[in-house]
Amino acid sequence: MAHYKAADSKREQFRRYLEKSGVLDTLTKVLVALYEEPEKPNSALDFLKHHLGAATPENPEIELLRLELAEMKEKYEAIVEENKKLKTKLAQYEPPQEEKRAE
């Protein structure tokens, strides 16, 4: 009987933890939103993931990574543009490919 009470006590502690941290409230809201959807989505799991993801605050590291990605994209575009210009310049000094083969 003591084993049963210990398991029950752990469950109750876990339930209180979920309640205090807002997990139960958030899950309930998302499930109610799914229930109230006039047209049910094909994937209920995707619906839950999307709505739960929107409910959690952004990790600051994610924003830093987004900024870094934007910077890298800009650098990439600049390098691609520079590469095009250098290829054009180089083409002026090199004979066309067909002339090279004839030699």
From Swiss-Prot:
The leader peptide range reads none
> Which terms in the Gene Ontology molecular function aspect does this entry carry?
transcription coactivator activity
Q: Which InterPro entries match?
A: AMY1
Q: Is Transcription regulation among this UniProt entry's keywords?
A: yes
PANTHER family tied to this protein? ASSOCIATE OF C-MYC AMY-1, C-MYC-BINDING PROTEIN
Explain the purpose of this protein. Answer: May control the transcriptional activity of MYC. Stimulates the activation of E box-dependent transcription by MYC.
State the protein's name. Answer: c-Myc-binding protein
